């Protein structure tokens, strides 16, 4: 049975394992995410999300296969992006650091997690959804496009300590059209 729930302290080691598996896959050349082992994401990334009560995990049969951070925090580079929809900060929900264990790819866990994020946004009264990803991350960009997210701009930045990142910003409006 698949369930998405708030993360707990006992999930941190498993989330770190997923980060490490992604770093290993990137180093082997089987995926291109644009992350750097030891820089981002790290155990501290998951711990900070947990401490802020913003870490969510997807578990199937008791094993965590996906995780992400959901909050209202818009990174500074978002100010330079031409968002189609304007919303007050408290009406914008952002998904950060969505990860799926590479060994569980193809099971729909990424889609399920994004759908959960959308349901949470509706429950919180947030009509504007924003996500960012490295321009190198073609798999995430395909997933988000498939789920109805629109790429609104790309901004060069230092992303969590990684220089030279081209950050693709995406949005989806859940409110009524204006």
Which residues does each PLM region occupy?
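A short beta-loop-alpha structural element at the N-terminal edge
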Residues: 3-17
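Hydrophobic adenine-recognition pocket in adenosine-nucleotide-binding enzymes
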Residues: 7, 98-100, 133
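Conserved GNAT-fold acetyl-CoA-binding loop/helix
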Residues: 16, 23-45
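Conserved beta-hairpin
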Residues: 54-68
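Conserved acyl-donor/pantetheine-binding loop and adjacent beta-alpha core of acyl/acetyltransferases
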Residues: 69-97, 102-105, 158-163
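C-terminal "cap" of GNAT-fold acetyltransferases
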Residues: 87-89, 127, 134-138, 145-147, ...
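Conserved acetyl-CoA-binding loop-helix of GNAT-fold acetyltransferases
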Residues: 100, 106-119, 142, 146
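Conserved GNAT acetyl-CoA-binding A-motif
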Residues: 114, 121-132
